[in-house]
Regions:
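Conserved acidic E/D residue at the C-terminus of a beta-strand in Rossmann-like folds
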Residues: 7-8, 163
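Active-site phosphate/pyrophosphate-binding segments
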Residues: 10, 20-149
Length: 168
């Protein structure tokens, strides 16, 4: 078994034990949420997967360049999100008294929901859980009551809600 460590800290136990190491260079984390380390590790995984696909020849012509260009455009997109302070403040003031929050997503968006829920509870101290969207009707929906905050994650336009879920 060959291992690749994706780490932020030079000399960490993973860096020492792995066969190869990718450093993210995120720097020290100030908050408990490890936002920089997580984001840079996600970018490293993306680059690694993209490069593996390029080397294996599984990307169509121009697709590799497009994927790397999209990653390079992230700082500008993050700046736009950060600039939307009024909307963020409006959401926070409207829902700050929520006792519970549920993050839901399907497919890759479920992974975003998991991390979003974790960040939300670590920083806001509001109870939060993440669920796969298709599983909401199998129990978790009974936990949703008046005042519960439900955050739906839908980042891929190719995801469509299935007919049974639409009526749940």
């Amino acid at each position: 078994v060959r291992t690749i460590g994706i780490v932020n800290v030079v000399g960490s136990s993973i860096a020492r034990e792995a066969d190869a190491t990718m450093y993210t260079w995120a720097g020290p984390e100030i908050s408990v949420a490890t936002t920089k380390a997580y984001s840079t590790q996600l970018a490293a995984c993306y680059l690694l997967a993209t490069e593996f696909a390029r080397v294996r020849g599984t990307l169509a012509d121009g697709q590799y360049e497009h994927l790397v260009t999209e990653l390079e455009a992230l700082p500008e997109k993050i700046e736009k999100t950060l600039a939307d302070k009024e909307r963020i403040q409006w959401f926070a003031s409207k829902y700050a008294n929520a006792k519970d929050a549920f993050f839901i997503g399907r497919g890759l968006d479920y992974a975003v929901a998991l991390e979003g829920s974790l960040k939300f509870k670590e920083i806001s101290y509001i109870h939060s859980e993440a669920f796969a969207a298709g599983e909401m009707k199998h129990g978790p929906i009974s936990l949703v009551e008046n005042g519960t905050l439900v955050v739906g994650i839908l980042t891929l336009s190719l995801i469509h809600i299935s007919e049974p879920t639409r009526h749940a």
